[in-house]
Amino acid sequence: MDSSNIRVIAFDADDTLWDCQGHFEVVMHHLYDELVPWVDRETAALELFSTERKNMRLLGYGVKAFTLSMLETAMRVSRNEMPAETINDILQRCYSLLEFPCTPLPEVELTLKALRDKIRNHTAPSTALTSLVCFTKGELLDQQHKLERSGLQHYFDYVEITSDKGEAEFRELCRKLDVRPEEMLMVGNSLKSDIAPALAVGCQAVYIPFHVTWQLEQHDHFEHQRMVQIDHFAQLLDIMNAHL
């Protein structure tokens, strides 16, 4: 990967800047427990995955889509026998996902601050990193609120929230930012949504795995000459050091 011409660094949000999937996993496992009178936990997990995948085209990503899939799975698998109070409990647990703390993951704020300072102090902006961007997918209000709860919003020059993240969305982001794809570096935890489409349109990428991956985001691992994998967030500064 060549960092010498990078003008924009775009960061994914969920499970890159803060933990998101971990909170969803807790709620999902509660559903599996509640469905034990009808099916084993493994079957319950498969049923939820099947429901989420079926609903993806119409509902997209986010808490609302997840909530509808959770309730649909609960009622279908239990053959509408699950008590109303249990259904309500599942609903309330899903609601809680709209307010969980978005505490920045280790080294995230330190790294963003260092990059922000370098941009502010650089004396050759025509050849230097000029912008930090948050590029995330999901429901507009939910993603906006999570960014606010994280306290990280002031580090970003621009925030783009989309319903999906594919090649078309990456091309559109480059157009809006007026950069060539090779001048943008995408940093994220999802090979499927962050890394593969960014590389496909010509961007560079830094892959930072998270300890848990949503089943619908899983992707076979691969290597690429324009991709670097890091183990912890501050390594991004090492990668950018020659450029900064």
Which residues fall in each region the model found?
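Short, surface-exposed acidic
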Residues: 36-51, 79-90, 155-158
